[in-house]
Amino acid sequence: MLRPGYEIFRYCDSELGEVSLHHHDFYEIYLFLNGSVEYSIESRIYRLLPGDILLIGPMELHQPRITLEKHPYERIVLWVNKSFLEQFSTPHTTLTHCFDSTVPGHTNLLRLAPTPRQHVTDLMERLVAETNSADYGSDLASIGCLIQLLVELNRQAANSAQHHELTDKSGPIVTNVLNYINDHYHEELSLDMLASRFFVNKYHLSHEFNRLVGTSIYRYVIQKRLVIAKQML
C-alpha cells in the first residue's frame, strides 16, 4: 500500500494477464461489477455474480481466474490496514469482525439482496470519489464513508452467516486436500502422499487441483508455509 490507512481502486480491464496465487498483510474488500470470474480463497472456489462482495483477511491465499472473451472485467478493490481498522473500532464494535474466519458461519462471500447490495455499491463508489477529490473536507468525508461501509458490511455478514449457503465449485477431493494442507502444512506433504491418503490417482488429483485452485499442490504448500512463517515473525 502506498498511502497510510487505506487505498481504493476502480478497475475496468479488457486485457489482463494471469494473476498468481498471492496474499498480503492487510484487509481486502472486493466488489465484483462485471465480467466472468472464478475466485479462490483458501479452500473455497466461487463463481462470482455482479454485485458479489468478497471479504479477504490478511494472509489468506487468494487468486482470481478471469475470462475476458465477452465482457470487460470490472471491479472495485479496497485495501485497509489492520491498524486503521483497530483505530476506529470500539469495545462494542469491532470492524474486523466480518473478516474473522474463526467466527461460526463465517463467509468470504456476501451475495446480498438488491437493496443492501445497491447501498454497499453506492458507498464504495462514493469512497472512490471522495478519495480522489480535492474538495474541502474530502479527507474527513472519505473516512466517514469508509466507516459507514465497514459497519454495513459487518451487519450484512452477521445476517448472511445465518442463512446464506456458499456455492463451492471445487469437488470434494480438492476441498478435502486443501483443508488437509491447511491443517498439516508443517508436515511432509507431497502429491504421492496426498493421492494415497485420499485414494485418488495422483495425475487426476494434480490436474483437478491445478484446474480448480489455479496452481500446483507444491506451490500451494510453499505459499501456505510462507504465510504462516510471516504470521509468526
Language model regions located:
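Short, conserved beta-strand element in jelly-roll/cupin
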Residues: 22-39, 55
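Basic/polar phosphate-binding segments, predominantly the helix-turn-helix DNA-binding elements
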Residues: 152-158, 176, 180-226
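All-alpha amphipathic helical-bundle segments outside canonical DNA-binding/catalytic cores
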Residues: 114-118, 131-148, 168
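Regular secondary-structure segments
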Residues: 33, 121-132, 178, 182-185, ...
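A hydrophobic/aromatic-rich effector-binding and dimerization subdomain
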Residues: 1-13, 61-132, 151-160
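Short acidic-glycine-tyrosine-enriched beta hairpin
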Residues: 43-57
